[in-house]
């Protein structure tokens, strides 16, 4: 069974025991979280498609870790002006493991 969930402005296709990196959630390692914005749930031709979400469906997950992404460098240089600026950014991420997919009753 699989599901498509929406979190952090992105959509993810998940199945049981999947480990995925998503945008930061306010939770610590070991906490249980539940995603209620389920767009599609099912298996094969028996998939239920929501409009926009499947009523009563949810995906349960466990927070594995809070991490940070790779550094992205923003570099600006103004030619012939002896002027430049370098700035770095690291995005915060949450690593979760999908524990259960609950279909609508």
Swiss-Prot record:
A single Gene Ontology CC term: ribosome
A single MF term (Gene Ontology): rRNA binding
InterPro entries: bL21-like, bL21-like_sf, Ribosomal_bL21
Signal sequence residues: none
Pfam families xref list: Ribosomal_L21p (PF00829)
Coiled-coil regions, chain positions: none
Any one biological process term the GO annotation gives: translation
Origin superkingdom: Bacteria
Record key words, sorted: Ribonucleoprotein, Ribosomal protein, RNA-binding, rRNA-binding
Family: Belongs to the bacterial ribosomal protein bL21 family.
Known function: This protein binds to 23S rRNA in the presence of protein L20.
Subunit comment: Part of the 50S ribosomal subunit. Contacts protein L20.
NCBIfam families from the UniProt entry: L21
Protein name: Large ribosomal subunit protein bL21
Source organism per UniProt: Rhizobium etli (strain ATCC 51251 / DSM 11541 / JCM 21823 / NBRC 15573 / CFN 42)
Name of the gene encoding the protein in the UniProt record: rplU
């Amino acid at each position: 069974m699989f599901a498509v969930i929406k979190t952090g402005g992105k959509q993810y296709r998940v199945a049981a025991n999947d480990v995925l990196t998503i945008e930061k959630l306010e939770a610590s390692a070991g906490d249980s979280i539940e995603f209620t914005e389920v767009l599609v749930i099912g298996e094969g031709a028996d998939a239920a498609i929501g409009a926009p979400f499947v009523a009563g469906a949810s995906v349960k997950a466990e927070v594995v870790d809070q991490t940070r992404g790779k550094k992205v460098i923003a570099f600006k240089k103004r030619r012939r002006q002896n002027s430049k600026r370098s700035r770095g950014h690291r995005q915060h991420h949450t690593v979760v493991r999908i524990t259960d997919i609950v279909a609508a009753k």
